[in-house]
Amino acid sequence: MSWLINDPTAAVLASLFIGIVLAAAAIPKFRHPDEFQGVVANYKLLPSFLVAPVAKLLPLVELLCAVALMIPPAREIAACVAAGLFIVFALALAINVGRGRTHIDCGCVRRPTSMSRIGMFHVMRAIALAGVSLYVAAVPVEFSRISIESGLMGLAAAAMLALLYMGADMLVGFPNSKNDLLKGNTND
């Protein structure tokens, strides 16, 4: 197991994965700012005067973290900021799940339908992403030790993990049953 912890390719893969996840989350928020502001408001955690500034700032921080994760001198700080974001997301999700407000959109990535729901999966996913981010912050990467082949393999693996992540996110957002879909009842 120590080979995984100390393997620079694994750290690069984790860094790329978190960067892709953050960029994929940020870009739709820039493209649909009013919709994302509604998502932030729907969490009912912020005073109304903070909803708009947070909705504008959050995608910027996500995108800056995604870019900074690719820049070696900024990587550790960006990973710590990303971990902080994921912990805040986990808390916001957990509070709303605890309140029984599972019908709201998590705001992670934009969906083409309004059928998304939140649940403990989203909370645990955010905690797992925080853990991966902390791993990225903790493991030093000596890029001179990474071959071109290993780097390309890490990039391909990170892209595949990100696609699996987004696919799982979409599947979890589907209605619970065919009857829910037929009735249009997705907010149970």
UniProtKB/Swiss-Prot annotation:
One GO term of the biological process aspect: methylamine metabolic process
Broad class of where this protein is predominantly found: membrane
InterPro entries: Methylamine_util_MauE
Keywords: Cell membrane, Membrane, Transmembrane, Transmembrane helix
Location(s), subcellular: Cell membrane
Known pathway: One-carbon metabolism; methylamine degradation
Membrane topology designation: Multi-pass membrane protein
Cellular-component GO terms for this entry: plasma membrane
Regions that span the bilayer: 8-28, 49-69, 77-97, 118-138, 152-172
Role summary: May be specifically involved in the processing, transport, and/or maturation of the MADH beta-subunit.
Name assigned to this protein: Methylamine utilization protein MauE
Biological source species: Methylobacillus flagellatus (strain ATCC 51484 / DSM 6875 / VKM B-1610 / KT)
